[in-house]
Curated annotation (Swiss-Prot):
Residues 32-55 are annotated as: Disordered. Disulfide bonds: none annotated. Residues 1-21 form the signal peptide. Keywords: Cell wall biogenesis/degradation, Hydrolase, Metal-binding, Metalloprotease, Periplasm, Protease, Signal, Zinc. It is found in: Periplasm. PANTHER family: MUREIN DD-ENDOPEPTIDASE MEPM, PEPTIDASE-RELATED. Cell wall peptidoglycan (PG) DD-endopeptidase, which may act as a substitute for other zinc-dependent PG endopeptidases (ShyA and ShyC) during zinc starvation. Hydrolyzes peptide cross-links which covalently connect adjacent PG strands probably to allow insertion of new glycans and thus cell wall expansion. Degrades purified whole PG sacculi in vitro. It is unclear how it is able to function in low zinc environments, but that may possibly be due to binding zinc with very high affinity, utilizing an alternative metal cofactor or that it may function independently of a bound metal cofactor. Disruption phenotype: Grows as wild-type in LB medium. Simultaneous deletion of shyA results in significant growth defect in minimal medium, but no growth or shape defect in LB medium. ShyAB double mutant does not grow in minimal medium treated with TPEN (N,N,N',N'-tetrakis(2-pyridylmethyl)ethylenediamine), a cell-permeable metal chelator with high affinity for zinc, and cells appear aberrantly thick and long. ShyB shyC double deletion mutant has no growth or shape defect in LB medium. The gene is shyB. One of its GO terms (cellular component) is plasma membrane. This is Peptidoglycan DD-endopeptidase ShyB.
Length: 426
């Protein structure tokens, strides 16, 4: 009996000792990592490295991001997209919706592109910051296509008088007082038939230029419009004033510009196959896809004419617009000619109204040969067939009254400025 009790005591001691080394239900296994169910977890931040065993690697979830890219000299859109890892197929979709706007073809070094990437690393929105008050927005839709939107802040327009004397060339003298190269080009274009800028100007000749400039706060947006031009030369005074119809006249109200033509093609090719329609809807998606121009049924090789005097500012080949060109007629009017077979002028060339500038074609994305023609007033498309274009040769009596009042205001402004300068010099 005593021997049996002794053996039982030994067994009890051994069982108790083993139990001390067994893990309890509440003690985690050191070879596993788990999160209890139904417990709130902050998925935006991974657990600290102290909580995670060294043999387990955590990959953070992709997050939406914005990429700000400053365009450099020599950049191309395809090169920028490739550099940022955006497929060329996406660029094609964006260029397709940009066909009726061609904003992306006007990108310049120093301007900004903003790309918004979703949490899968795909481009969801492209924003082209054209200026501090203007931006073109391309947004990916549910079907994978892109839509276009243009946003603009009105800002404040101020009239500023730039005055100076000729010392060297007009271009150098004008930039010295604060005029930009673009403004100088507009002035010389308007006055080309009145002043020989290479021979007529002499040192000491005076100029006064009234410019309407856009500001956002105290920041100049770069958008401007020439309102009045005056040269006091040794041989006499020459001036030009912008009227409400977008054309320049001398101080007596006589036009300095030849009238516009509405049609860029011969009478035989003036059949319109698709008119201007800013509210045109896509037949499948139902989204508004504007048609910002007028399509003429032209065969390949039909002559295309400039509708007004101006300067060729764009000559380009586009995957959807085809071969196209843009003519700047003054600071208000521009015209575009798309799907051309052959372009007969060069960028920077001055052209006359009625001059043959191209041959119609079928380049780019289109269903058949035609000419797509656009008129832009202050960079906004208008219906070339209905818009109030500068086709009249003189001002009406009502127009002339308000015009002459503006001329008088300008003269008083110049006189006041000269008096102020004279006081400063005494």
């Amino acid at each position: 009996m005593g021997q049996f009790r002794f053996l039982a005591l030994i067994v009890a001691v051994l069982c108790f000792s083993v139990a001390l080394f067994l893990p309890t239900a509440d003690e985690p296994d050191q070879d596993s990592y788990s999160v209890p169910l139904n417990q709130s977890v902050n998925t935006s931040q991974p657990p600290s490295s102290e909580m995670v065993p060294s043999d387990i690697r955590l990959t953070p979830l992709p997050q939406p991001k914005r990429i700000h890219y400053m365009v450099k000299v020599g950049d191309t859109l395809s090169g920028i997209f490739a550099q940022l890892g955006v497929p060329y197929s996406i660029l094609q979709k964006i260029l397709s919706v940009d066909l009726d706007h061609l904003q992306l073809d006007m990108i310049q070094p120093g301007e900004e592109l903003e790309l918004m990437m979703d949490d899968m690393g795909q481009l969801s929105r492209l924003i082209y910051h054209m200026s501090i008050v203007e931006k073109a927005i391309y947004t990916r839709e549910n079907d994978g296509s892109f839509s276009y939107d243009f946003q603009e802040i009105s800002g404040e327009w101020r009239e500023i008088l730039f005055s100076g004397e000729i010392n060297g060339s007009f271009s150098v003298s004008a930039r010295r007082v604060g005029l930009t190269s673009s403004q100088v080009a507009n002035i010389t274009q308007v006055m080309k038939d009145k002043i020989d800028f290479s021979r007529s100007l002499r040192a000491g000749d005076r100029f006064d230029i009234l410019v309407k400039q856009q500001y956002l706060g105290e920041h100049n947006t770069g958008n401007s419009e020439i309102k009045a031009i005056s040269f006091k030369l040794a041989k006499g005074d020459v001036s030009a004033f912008l009227a409400e119809d977008g054309r320049f006249y001398d101080r007596a109200g006589n036009s300095l510009e030849r009238a516009f033509n509405r049609y860029p093609v011969d009478k035989a090719y003036r059949q319109i196959t698709s008119g201007f329609n800013p509210k045109r809807k896509h037949p499948v998606t139902g989204r508004v896809v504007p048609h910002n121009g007028t399509d003429f049924a032209t065969p390949i090789g039909a002559p295309v004419y400039s509708t007004g005097d101006g300067k060729v500012i764009v000559v380009r080949k586009h995957p959807y617009a085809g071969n196209y060109l843009v003519i700047e007629h003054n600071s208000v009017y521009k015209t575009r000619y798309l799907h051309l077979d052959k372009i007969l002028v060069k960028k920077g060339q001055l052209v006359k109204r009625g001059q043959k500038i191209a041959l119609a074609g079928a380049t780019g994305r289109l269903t058949g040969p035609h000419l797509h023609f656009e008129v832009l007033v202050r960079n906004r498309p208008v219906d070339a067939m209905k818009a109030d274009l500068p086709i009249a040769k003189s001002l009406s009596s009502n127009q002339k009254t308000s015009f002459l009042a503006r001329v008088s205001e300008f003269d008083h402004l110049v006189q006041a400025n000269q008096q102020e300068v004279a006081l400063d010099e005494t």
